[in-house]
């Protein structure tokens, strides 16, 4: 082995351990970074041709591998838009320039426009609420916005009201009634109109139904119910046209079909009227299946988006970009999209974050090993230098 080769090998070893120390330092610095994937320096030997009488020292080559496919721990948070993936898959996010990337960093919050953006400035992409898994494409995804879906006012047009009227009831005195129930409806502005529904027995199997506006007592709908004397089933009169036009609304078709006249108390089995007041979003929930559900002030819930997950054949071969994001490459394979809990993807966990997969204890151990190896390689170089000095001084 030549002295020059010895010194060259020592320098190669020092450079390799310096690379290892750099990855260890990066891992320690990002031990608390959400979604960070540990970097690891891998070594391979470089062998030079040798002869039986002379050995030529080679060197060591290094390559950095990222543990992109290794899941970090999951911790709970207080925000429903903090998202972690339990299992395979990556969130699809969009950068400021419109380029798309993959990430496990799910610390999303609404920006001033209501778009969900993570701490690195990348926007979460989602599919439509009714999108089929087979039709998913990256180009077809949109930024998830949680502020632009306020519920508009909707006037009432239809309702179902099913009751049992006691067969033992007697006709009341003039001007009286047997039973009364109040229902809520809405005009086209979303203003509430309370409807009082009166049931008055007028014959053995006949009831008069009167619908009045509770605010002024004006009758705005009426019908007569006739029941089968044997079975107590409704025979006719099961629809009431309630005219809300004078109050800024439409005609409400109130369906009483299914009502009965039988023994027992006055009971209500169904009372539903469509329509709603305008309502803003109170909060957002995200299901394990990726459904982004808006919770409105009036208690209504509506699915706004479904968050798909992406995966590649070899995740560890993706290119790492600043911000804990990854760019698919030729070595990693093509991007495949699917919804959580299907298509080989994991589940999304709301109110949680995936922590860094770097282990401080392991990193400190690696740092000590790299430090010792660096020192040993420096000793190799130093010894070669000293021997070279001896060789040079032989002429003196």
UniProtKB/Swiss-Prot annotation:
Protein name per UniProt: Flagellar hook protein FlgE
NCBIfam families attached to this UniProt entry: FlgEFG_subfam
Organism: Brucella abortus biovar 1 (strain 9-941)
UniProt-listed SUPFAM superfamilies: Flagellar hook protein flgE (SSF117143)
GO BP terms, alphabetized: bacterial-type flagellum-dependent swarming motility
PANTHER family linked: FLAGELLAR HOOK PROTEIN FLGE (PTHR30435:SF1), FLAGELLAR PROTEIN (PTHR30435)
Annotated family: Belongs to the flagella basal body rod proteins family.
Gene3D superfamilies: Flagellar hook protein FlgE (2.60.98.20)
Top-level taxon of origin: Bacteria
Cysteine pairings via disulfide bonds: none
UniProt entry keywords in alphabetical sequence: Bacterial flagellum
Protein localization: Bacterial flagellum basal body
A GO CC annotation given for this chain: bacterial-type flagellum hook
InterPro entries: Falgellar_hook_FlgE_sf (IPR037058), Flag_bb_rod_N (IPR001444), Flagellar_basal_body_rod_CS (IPR019776), Flagellar_FlgE/F/G (IPR020013), Flg_bb/hook_C_dom (IPR010930), FlgE/F/G-like (IPR037925), FlgE_D2 (IPR011491), LlgE_F_G-like_D1 (IPR053967)
Pfam families assigned: Flg_bb_rod, Flg_bbr_C, FlgE_D2, LlgE_F_G_D1
């Amino acid at each position: 082995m030549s002295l020059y080769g010895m010194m060259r090998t020592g320098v190669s070893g020092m450079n390799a351990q310096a690379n290892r120390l750099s990855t260890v330092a990066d891992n320690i610095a990002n031990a608390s970074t959400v979604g960070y994937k540990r970097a690891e320096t891998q070594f391979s030997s470089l062998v030079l041709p040798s002869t039986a009488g002379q050995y030529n020292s080679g060197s060591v080559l290094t390559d950095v591998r990222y543990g992109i496919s290794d899941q970090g721990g999951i911790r709970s948070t207080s925000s429903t838009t903090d998202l972690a993936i339990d299992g395979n898959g990556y969130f699809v996010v969009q950068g400021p320039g419109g380029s798309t990337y993959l990430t496990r960093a799910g610390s999303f919050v609404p920006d001033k426009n209501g778009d969900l953006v993570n701490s690195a400035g990348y926007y979460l992409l989602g599919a439509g609420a009714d999108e089929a898994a087979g039709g998913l494409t990256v180009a077809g995804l949109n930024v998830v916005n949680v502020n632009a879906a306020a519920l508009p006012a909707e006037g009432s047009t239809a309702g179902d009201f099913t009751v049992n009227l006691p067969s033992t009831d007697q006709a009341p005195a003039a001007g009286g009634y047997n039973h009364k129930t109040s229902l809520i409806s809405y005009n086209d502005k979303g203003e509430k109109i309370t409807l009082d529904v009166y049931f008055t027995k007028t014959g053995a199997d006949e009831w008069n139904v009167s619908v009045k506006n509770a605010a002024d007592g004006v009758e705005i709908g009426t019908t007569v119910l006739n029941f089968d004397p044997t079975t107590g089933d409704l025979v006719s009169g099961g629809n009431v046209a309630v005219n809300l036009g004078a109050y800024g609304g439409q005609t409400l078709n109130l369906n009483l079909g299914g009502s009965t006249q039988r023994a027992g108390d006055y009971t209500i089995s169904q009372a539903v009227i469509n329509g709603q007041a305008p309502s803003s979003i109170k909060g957002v929930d995200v299901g394990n299946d990726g459904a982004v559900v808006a919770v409105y002030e009036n208690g209504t819930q509506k699915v706004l988006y479904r968050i798909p997950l992406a995966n590649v054949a070899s995740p560890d071969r993706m290119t790492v970009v600043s911000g804990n994001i990854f760019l698919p490459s030729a070595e990693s394979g093509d991007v495949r999209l699917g919804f959580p809990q299907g298509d080989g993807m994991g589940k999304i966990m709301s109110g949680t974050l995936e922590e860094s997969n770097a282990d401080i204890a392991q990193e400190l151990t690696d740092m000590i090993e790299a430090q010792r190896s660096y020192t040993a390689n420096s000793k190799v170089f130093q010894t070669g230098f000293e021997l070279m000095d001896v060789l040079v001084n032989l002429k003196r």
